[in-house]
C-alpha cells in the first residue's frame, strides 16, 4: 500500500502538465479566431462603405478625406472615428485601401488589415494582408479638371 500513496499525486502532476498547455492553446486559438472574425466584419463594412462613397481623387491614391473616413469605418465602425476600436490595439495605420482603377474612376475597392498583432501566451500572431475584402465600386467619381 505504501508504494501506491504517491501515484495519485504523480498522475495529477502529469495530467496537469499536459492539460494546462492544451487548454491554454485551445483558448488562444478561439480568441484569435474571434478577433479575426471581428476584423473580417470590420473590413467588410469598410469596403462596403468605400464602394458607395464618392471617390474624389483622379488617381489611384485616395484623397485624405476618403482614406480617413474609410479607415475610421474599419477601426471604429463609423466614418467620424468616435468610440472604441472594434478590436483592441487596432489603429488606422493597420488599414490599407487600394482602389483598382478603370480610367478616372475605381472599378473596385480593396480594404485589408496589415501589421495588426495579437499577443498570445507563448507567441504573437501578426495579420499581414488578411483579412481582405474587395467590393465593386458603385459610387460616383467626382469630376476633376
Spans of features found by a protein language model:
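Short, conserved structural patches
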Residues: 37, 41, 45-145
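Alpha-helical transmembrane segments
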Residues: 28, 32-36
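Alpha-helical hydrophobic helix detector
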Residues: 8-27
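Alpha-helix C-capping/helix-to-loop hinge sites
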Residues: 26-29, 53
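N-terminal leader/signal peptides at the extreme start of proteins
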Residues: 1-5
Amino acid at each position: 500500500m505504501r508504494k501506491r500513496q504517491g501515484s495519485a499525486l504523480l498522475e495529477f502532476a502529469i495530467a496537469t502538465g499536459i492539460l494546462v498547455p492544451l487548454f491554454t492553446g485551445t483558448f488562444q486559438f478561439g480568441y484569435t479566431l474571434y478577433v479575426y472574425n471581428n476584423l473580417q466584419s470590420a473590413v467588410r463594412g469598410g469596403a462596403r462603405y468605400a464602394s458607395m462613397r464618392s471617390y474624389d481623387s483622379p488617381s489611384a491614391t485616395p484623397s485624405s478625406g476618403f482614406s480617413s473616413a474609410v479607415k475610421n469605418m474599419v477601426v471604429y465602425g463609423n466614418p467620424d472615428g468616435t468610440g472604441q476600436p472594434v478590436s483592441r490595439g487596432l489603429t488606422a495605420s493597420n488599414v490599407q485601401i487600394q482602389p483598382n482603377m478603370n480610367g478616372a474612376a475605381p472599378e473596385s475597392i480593396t480594404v485589408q488589415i496589415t501589421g495588426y498583432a495579437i499577443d498570445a501566451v507563448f507567441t504573437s500572431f501578426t495579420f499581414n494582408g488578411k483579412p481582405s475584402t474587395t467590393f465593386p465600386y458603385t459610387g460616383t467619381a467626382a469630376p476633376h479638371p
